[in-house]
Amino acid sequence: MDLDLGVRRPYSRRGFLLGALSATTAGVLAACSQPSQPAATSAPAAQPPAAPTKPAAAASPAASPAAAASPAAAASPAASPVAKPAASPAAAAPPSPAAAAGQFSASNPPPVQNPNKSFAGATVIYYGDGVGIGNDLDKATAQRFEQDTGVKINVIPRPQSATDTFAQYQRFFQGQSADLDVLMVDVIWPGAFAPNLVDLGPKLGDATKNHYPGIVANDTVGGKLVSMPFFSDFGTLYYRKDLLQKYNISAPPKTWDELEQQATTIMNGEKGSNPNFTGFVWQGNAYEGLTCDALEWLASSGGGKIVENGKCTINNPQAVAILTKMKGWIGTIAPRGVTTYQEEDARNAFQSGGAAFMRNWPYAYALGQKDDSPVKGKFDVAALPASSGQKPVGTIGGWALAVSKYSKNQDASIEFIRYLTSPEVQTYRAVVGSFVPTIPAVASDPNVQQAQPFLANLADVERVARPSSETGENYNQVSTAFFQAVNNIENGQDPGSVLPQAQNQIQRLLG
């Protein structure tokens, strides 16, 4: 299998400090205490055509398969961190992969532990990561699994947009297609897809004891383990620390007003040598990623969490104010093309040296620190800003792995998931790709903490999540209505007119 190395997302409710981590870092790796409810089972609305403006690709990563990336949303909210860690799950401690972590490179994943060769000769079709370095790590681990077990893994990158991925999976399941064996599942999807997924409990139940119990609960529907935790996620602010120093800015912005001021100062100074330099980039396209970003804007400004207590709450003065402010960023501190950006577009703009600030997920950290990255050693990660008097927030999420009920190679597929979700592979992915682990023993590994130093900066961030619990099977339609409304505002429409209409539309969906 060829490795084309080069160049992903969002868990559910109330975060609590876990495992043997330091209290600071552990708060960032909070698990969810309540499982999310099913996301909608109807296909997502069609996406509007993208505007032409795109950032130049960053030097470091290889091109990704689709035009843009997606985070796939978060499930129910993990609230602010608690001061002391909870005990890690009661189970035999997983083997420590720390000693081997330093030997990992993208093309050198760990071997399969006690490989099961009973299914040698089988072929497993894996719809894996389509964003950032994730596809490269999928290819490398697939190659290693094939080498150790004799099972061939056909890696197919999922669409980079989570919205498009959801629709693609629906088509597979509606046709009961055998052309899908292992699939990546966003944290808000287990309930929606549960009838089409294999119960992993009989084969992988013991392995779940290694993972944060709240995340396992999110992957359990009706007493069945329908997916296995793969990695976690949350929204963060990337900033050019060298440029802050250059322009005598003492610290990254803590408020949205400060972000505007700092971005303007840096832009004015940099445009002389780089006319295309911009201040701030994010995921502005009309897709699930914009729901994550806009939820952060609202929740960090007293504007609510989209749906609360069964009611859509987006039409309020605080939401109007922050979205009016965001609208003002377009064409000033942000490029007009940001209204079409997904994860990789934003990362490419930032990593190529063309932006001062970026909202993105942890995966971008490892890519930005690669040897061929123009911004290696020049950036850091902080909490996203908030409005004055409000707390910083970050949409939290992650992905899991599942086996289709219509797969013809279910046992081989389960063995592949056992490998991908093992402590050894989670350590490899955390060290090489800055994927946030779901296993406490991995999160507390010094090698992982060294590879993800930014986590210590994020302990005080309140975790928020998309309202999948509140909206149940209507979530996908609710999110679509919300992100389309926000994208309309980005493209010039008045928040005072758009939000009442969107709130009425969402409320009708809720009944």
Briefly describe each language-model feature range.
Residues 226-230, 235, 260-311, 355:
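Extracytoplasmic/periplasmic solute-binding protein
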Residues 50-110, 117-118, 245, 462-511:
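Conserved C-terminal helix/tail region of periplasmic/extracytoplasmic solute-binding proteins
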Residues 1-11, 19-31, 417:
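N-terminal secretory signal peptides
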Residues 99, 106-113, 218-219, 379-383, ...:
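Long, aromatic- and glycine/proline-rich binding clefts that accommodate carbohydrate-like moieties
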Residues 93-118, 186-235, 260, 275-276, ...:
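Hinge/lid segment of periplasmic solute-binding proteins
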Residues 262-264, 309-340, 384:
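Glycine-centered hinge/linker elements that transmit conformational signals in sensory
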Residues 144-214, 218-220, 242-254, 349, ...:
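Extracytoplasmic "Venus flytrap"/periplasmic binding protein-like
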Residues 115, 170-171, 178-183, 207-244, ...:
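A structural signal for short loop-to-beta-strand junctions that line the ligand-binding cleft
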